[in-house]
Amino acid sequence: MKIIVIGQSGSGKSTLARKIKEITDFPLLPLDLLWHTTDYSIQAKKWFLQEQQLFMVSNPSWIVEGNYTSTLEERIKEADKIIWLKVPRYLAIYRVVWRSLKRKINKKSRPDMPESFSEKLNREYLEFLSFIWHFEENNEPKIQQLIQVANARNKLIILKTRREKQEFLTKLKIESKN
């Protein structure tokens, strides 16, 4: 089974992807971990796509977590399940700010980010929060279009609440035992 987990920052993608990995034992590729080890150049973008392709062809089953719409089309085509997490924008902002504060206080990095990655309360961070706030109107139409073009609506599972996530994980546990 090939699973992608998408959704705005703060929607719970990384957490859900790790839980799916615990249940299935499929290899997991967190795209933030991959991308934020680069210098963000044009060469890095090519490498980023190649690494995703290599991961997908090297593993019969996998989980890829992250949006990155520039490379999403190929992942949508390859995936058996598209898990799209949708949460209200205020909740996503709250979660992102809270995890940033926790990281600053605890001085720990996220497991889905490189050790060297650090967030600062600067203009770039505020732009990131603005990106999250406007994700629904600026990014969701592109994602919906990619899903439609790939004729992948039958692969799509939209999860909006903790309960829906838990029900999905419970169902996945049952499926993975069979």
Sequence positions of predicted segments:
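Walker A (P-loop) ATP-phosphate-binding motif of ABC ATPase nucleotide-binding domains
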Residues: 2
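The conserved Walker
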Residues: 9
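Hydrophobic anchor at the beta1->P-loop junction of P-loop NTPases
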Residues: 5
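Conserved nucleotide-sensing/catalytic segment adjacent to the nucleotide-binding pocket
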Residues: 27-82, 87
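Hydrophobic positions on the alpha1 helix immediately C-terminal to the Walker A/P-loop
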Residues: 16
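NTP-dependent small-molecule kinase module
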Residues: 23, 130-178
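A glycine- and Lys/Arg-enriched "phosphate-lid" helix/loop adjacent to the NTP-binding pocket
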Residues: 87-139
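Conserved lysine of the Walker
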Residues: 13
